[in-house]
Amino acid sequence: MSAVTTLFPNEAIGTPEIRVSHQIKGRTPDALHIPTKDLQDFQRTSYFERMAFIIKIPGIAETINGNRLELTIGGVRAYNQENLYSKKAYEKFKFFIGFQNMVCCNLCVSTDGFQSEIRAMSSLDLEAKMIQVLANYRAQEHLNSMQNLLEHNLTERDFAQIIGKSRLYNFLPKKEKLVLPDLLLNDGHINTVAKDYYQDESFCRNANGDISMWEFYNLLTGSNKTSYIDTFLERGVNAFDFSKGISKALSDRNSIYSWFLS
């Protein structure tokens, strides 16, 4: 919280929201030989393998296509990505600043607002590195890029082509895949995007079957809600890059993203 209040001293800061997953139950070292049924409460241990938090700053907000976006800061701590038995020299965290779409609670995160790995030796070290990420974030540029998505539309044929090529993407030979942009969403996410193209109340197709790139982007971030805590930030950033890339490919068939439309 101190890093947030340092950068936004005049803003009302929301109460942190915390989510945990993958509970791990264990025992203290002195109870290794005791059968599980005979363990005393003080001999049992429990921790969560993954934790995520977000902090909203509702006073900094923008509206895109009728959707209110509020500045949001958050991070992830994931033990599953570390060797807990090795000698620790530092702690690792993921950290981001972006916007949350209050219509659907989708997180909108860009590359410059995300640090996939912060290595910190102490809480003060962590705070300093968080402040650096916050200071380098270009909020208005991020908002402008999201606003620009409204200027591009996918036809039903375009959308179907993207869905089909996205399903093929993960089966491409490695050599062919290397020359294409990354797509981190898996088949489960793509299936959700296809379903919500018809069924989502806020971002579905219009009567002609068309969908704006802003709506398409929100279908991607909506599908990302099913991702594990330790992977959803990378996929969220990738969803934004992918949406911008497809937008460009609609008018530039020489774009590396044009493969998804061809």
Label for each model-derived stretch:
Residues 1-10, 15-17:
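Charge-rich, low-complexity N-terminal segments
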Residues 12-262:
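Intrinsically disordered, low-complexity regions enriched in serine/threonine
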